[in-house]
Structures are given as C-alpha cells and as structure tokens.
Amino acid sequence: MRCPYCQNADTRVVDSRLIGEGEQVRRRRQCPSCGERFTTHEAPELVYPRVVKSDGRREAFDEDKLRLGFRRALEKRPVATEAVEAAVRRVCKRVSGAGEREVAANVIGEYVMEELRELDVVAYVRFASVYRRFEDVGAFREVIEGLEQHRRDDD
C-alpha cells in the first residue's frame, strides 16, 4: 500500500486486528522511507441485489437507508449502537448472501422486523406499524399478541 505521507509504494504491516464481529481488519502500517505510521481498514466488498419496490420500481440496495430505518424505530430506546450495527450487518449479509440479482423490499422489511423483535419489542411495534401500514388498534393488538406468543415459544 502506498504511504499517504511520502507516496512511497512500499509499506509494512506493524499490527493487524479483527474488529466488530470479525468482518473487518484494522491494520497499523509503517512506511520504511519516512517512518510515518497510519491505520487502514479492510472489509469485503459485498455485491447487493437490486431492490424491487411494491410498485415495481427497482433501486440499488442502500445500507444507509437500512441503518436509518433501524435508527428511526429505535429512537430514544435503550439499545447500544454496537447492537444496531450488528443487526444492520446481519441483514446486509442475508441480502447479499441470497445470491439473487433482485430482492423484494418486503423481504428486507421482514429481515428488519426479525432483528428488531430480538433487539427491542417497542421498536419492533413501531417499525411494524409503519411497514405494515396499520390503520386501527386491532392491527397493533395482532402484532403484540404475536410478540407474546413468540416470547412464550422461546421460554
């Protein structure tokens, strides 16, 4: 890797560590020419399928949009940022790992709901109310009853 300070074409790795859930590598490098040290991060470049919206439009998968959806649902909830990032990574991995050229937006929505159900039930209900376009209290009741059943099944 080229040194960002002196542009020397050769640098050496001083230290390597896995970060996150082992999906990124942090490397400390040193330039033998100028002696400067710098940090690099390596992560796999995932190829995501196109997202097919409910009206038939197709758009590129957007990890930032996914992250924003999680953050909106989890706003003012006691969930660690690391837990949210891990959930985002799991959804991204499922989307890219399917090996499909296209994925329906509702499939991604279901992945998000599965993650939110485990992270925070209030956020799950918030997300479900928007995602499934609740129009009455009965829809909320059905989701809450489903949550209670899921909890009983886990016990």
From Swiss-Prot:
Gene Ontology terms, MF aspect: ATP binding; DNA binding; zinc ion binding
Keywords, in A-Z order: ATP-binding, DNA-binding, Metal-binding, Nucleotide-binding, Repressor, Transcription, Transcription regulation, Zinc, Zinc-finger
Domain ATP-cone, residue spans: 49-139
A GO biological process held by the record: negative regulation of DNA-templated transcription
Zinc finger (unnamed): 3-34
Cofactor binding: number and manner: Binds 1 zinc ion.
InterPro entries documented for this protein: ATP-cone_dom (IPR005144), NrdR-like_N (IPR055173), RNR_NrdR-like (IPR003796)
Source superkingdom: Bacteria
Record PROSITE patterns: ATP_CONE (PS51161)
Cofactor(s) in the UniProt record: Zn(2+)
NCBIfam families hit by this protein: transcriptional regulator NrdR (TIGR00244)
PANTHER family: TRANSCRIPTIONAL REPRESSOR NRDR
Family recorded in the similarity comment: Belongs to the NrdR family.
Function comment: Negatively regulates transcription of bacterial ribonucleotide reductase nrd genes and operons by binding to NrdR-boxes.
Name of the protein: Transcriptional repressor NrdR
Species for this entry: Halorhodospira halophila (strain DSM 244 / SL1)
Source taxonomy: Bacteria, Pseudomonadati, Pseudomonadota, Gammaproteobacteria, Chromatiales
